[in-house]
Amino acid sequence: VVRDDSIIFWKNYKEFTPDTKVYVASAGKWVAAAVIGAVVDRTDLDWNDNVKKWIPEFKNDVKGMITLRQLLSHTSGVRPYLPEPRVDNYNQLDSAVMEILPLDTVFTPGTRFEYGGLAMQIAGRMAEKAMNKEFEELFQKLIARPLGMKSSHFTPVNTDGGHAPMLGGGLCTTLHDYMRFLDMIYHNGVFEEKQILKPETIHEMQADQVGN
């Protein structure tokens, strides 16, 4: 429990400590979104950019008109998860995104909200293209190292046969590391007097994206 930037209470149970590395599932979604926000801060990538601008393979597909904003706000129409049975045998987001390309949308982009993680793979690939770096490298350079998150990374849950970074559920971190991220969010993008994310990016991350 933190109050006024000071820990006033903490307790751990059994083998779990503040330094135990765990997968935090969907609690990593906004960490991935922060990485993408940091790319928006530094490049021509914009929240309202269409997918096809950065991934030309989508130019003749309805999903090519989906915006980065829709991908990250669960309003894109991209199905929530890959259909079963399906095995992701790809090590990179570029290959993983090509698995999404032939899948039909489940609703017209921008007309509904449906929670899921698959759309974030496309968003991550847009960020990769904008900075010409792989997503894990972006995370380490733009978020993890500036925050001192030394034990955190996006990694495969199962490495058998390879696996692309899971932006919607693949963050492995510790309580200490995660608190550093939360501290930055709470202080409007600032951590230890360093501006990690622009205030307007924090605002976009927390704004109502559906309107109803």
Regions found by a protein language model. Name each.
Residues 31-32:
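Active/ligand-binding-proximal structured segments within catalytic/core domains
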Residues 74, 119-126, 165-191, 200-209:
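Active-site-proximal alpha-helical segments within enzyme catalytic domains
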Residues 18, 23, 27, 41-79, ...:
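Active-site helix/loop module of the DD-peptidase/beta-lactamase fold
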Residues 12, 82-86:
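Short, solvent-exposed loop/turn and secondary-structure capping segments
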Residues 1-17, 47, 148-150:
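A short, well-structured edge-of-sheet supersecondary motif
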Residues 5-6, 20, 95, 105:
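Coil residues (strongly favoring Ser/Thr
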Residues 26-27, 114-119:
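Catalytic nucleophile serine of serine hydrolases
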Residues 24, 109-113, 164-172:
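Solvent-exposed loop and edge beta-strand segments that line ligand/cofactor-binding
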